[in-house]
From Swiss-Prot:
One Gene Ontology cellular component: nucleus
Name used for this protein in its record: Inhibitory POU protein
Motif (POU-IV box): 86-95
Ranges for domain POU-specific: 222-299
Entries under PANTHER family matching the protein: INHIBITORY POU PROTEIN, POU DOMAIN
Transmembrane segments: none
GO molecular function, one term: transcription corepressor activity
Location of this chain's protein in the cell: Nucleus
Record's keyword annotation contains Repressor: yes
Function: Modulates gene transcription; simultaneously generates both a specific activator and an inhibitor of gene transcription, capable of modulating two distinct regulatory programs during neural development. Has a role in olfactory behavior.
InterPro entries listed in its UniProt record: HD, Homeobox_CS, Homeodomain-like_sf, Lambda_DNA-bd_dom_sf, POU, POU_dom, POU_domain_TF
Stored CDD domains: homeodomain (cd00086)
Pfam families documented for this protein: Homeodomain, Pou
Organism listed in the record: Drosophila melanogaster (Fruit fly)
Length: 396
């Protein structure tokens, strides 16, 4: 018996060193002490998750074999089996934890690479490799620097980059963008210009004669004229034109009488569009000095009431207003007597009456016409009053 105990003790001493201090140690140990017994799993981590799992399982199996009751002849085999089951469970937990850390460490970089590939694929298939373009090389280099960030903090540090001050790399990128825009503005000025500029360049084609005429006349228009100034002048021009009694068509025709080099007659629609501000900005600027010159000349002629035969007339040549014809009392009584006999005389009768009274034929004809209208108004004013008295007599 003593011999067998001694041999058992020798076997215990020759076995693997224990992580517990004594033979009759308690059956429960904390997880930290169990981890001290196990080899450090981080030493066995490799690039592949499968090799990591296989090595950890192998270490766990070696630990179980070292604590097997069959090898060291432990009499507390049941207690050791419980401890070994706890150790295996902790090892499995560690394996799952390292797998999760390994997966999370690979996800951000994988996402960033996918974003880069999708960014290049959306813009179409590249005609040349990215390395041939220095601009794309620099962008790729900046993305590689982002990939070198901490995987766990890369998703949070990417967002504030746009809010932070520009780094030298970003400043260089913005400088490249500005240079590209400058180059595009030289090659395609109409594409990068605003809506107003494009509209002006297009609408200037409609009336190129106006701009050429203004340049030939030496009326150098101010290209920086404020639109509000043009609007005020158009309204003032319209009011003064109406006050002078001149139509838009008359203004268009009278522009040819200004004798300005290259300035001819314009259509009524052009003057109308100027007053309604529907012309383009460039055409409004070109037409303003011409209309201003006409307005000053027209107001001067209307004020002076004189027409110089050598000076051009910018106002329409209207007929002189006919004076009102006054008929003397004796002729008037004779006409009334003729009207009482025949309210509608013939043309020959009107000519005979005019010759007898020494009046113009047209004057006699107009007098008979006016007298008929006067009698008609008198009759129409008397008839309703008579109808009213008649209806009242019947009691209606």
């Amino acid at each position: 018996m003593t011999m067998s105990m001694y041999s058992t003790t020798d076997k215990m001493k020759m076995s693997a060193p224990s992580c517990f201090p004594g033979r009759y140690s308690p059956s429960y140990r904390s997880s930290e002490q169990m981890r001290r017994c196990m080899p450090n799993p981080s030493i066995h981590i490799s690039s592949s998750c499968d090799s990591l799992e296989s090595r950890l399982l192998e270490d766990a199996s070696l630990l179980c074999n070292s604590w097997s009751a069959r090898q060291n002849g432990d009499i507390f085999a049941g207690i050791n089996d419980g401890i070994l089951s706890r150790a295996e469970a902790l090892a499995a937990v560690d394996i799952q934890k390292h797998q999760a850390q390994h997966v999370h460490s690979q996800m951000p970089s994988q996402i960033k690479h996918d974003v880069m590939y999708h960014h290049h694929s959306m813009s179409g298939p590249p005609q040349r490799p990215l390395q041939e373009n220095p601009f794309s090389r620099q962008m790729h280099h900046s993305m590689d620097q982002l990939d070198m960030l901490d995987p766990t903090g890369s998703m949070t540090t990417l967002a504030p980059i746009s809010e932070s001050p520009l780094t030298p790399t970003h400043q260089h990128l913005h400088g490249s963008y500005h240079s590209m825009n400058h180059m595009m503005s030289h090659h395609h000025p109409g594409t990068l210009s605003g809506h107003t500029g494009g509209h002006h360049g297009h609408s200037a084609v409609h009336h190129p004669v106006i701009t050429a005429a203004v340049a030939a006349a030496g009326l150098h228009p101010d290209t920086d004229t404020d639109p509000r100034e043009l609007e005020a002048f158009a309204e003032r021009f319209k009011q003064r034109r109406i006050k002078l009694g001149v139509t838009q068509a008359d203004v268009g025709k009278a522009l040819a009488n200004l004798k300005l080099p290259g300035v001819g007659a314009l259509s009524q629609s052009t003057i109308c569009r100027f007053e309604s501000l529907t012309l383009s900005h460039n055409n409004m600027i070109a037409l303003k000095p011409i209309l201003q010159a006409w307005l000053e000349e027209a107001e001067a002629q209307a004020k002076n009431k004189r027409r110089d035969p050598d000076a051009p007339s910018v106002l329409p040549a209207g007929e002189k207003k006919r004076k009102r014809t006054s008929i003397a009392a004796p002729e008037k009584r004779s006409l009334e007597a003729y009207f009482a006999v025949q309210p509608r005389p013939s043309g020959e009768k009107i000519a005979a009456i005019a010759e007898k009274l020494d009046l113009k034929k047209n004057v006699v004809r107009v007098w008979f016409c006016n007298q008929r209208q006067k009698q008609k108004r008198i009759v129409s004013s008397v008839t309703p009053s008579m109808t009213g008295h008649g209806s009242a007599g019947f009691g209606y």
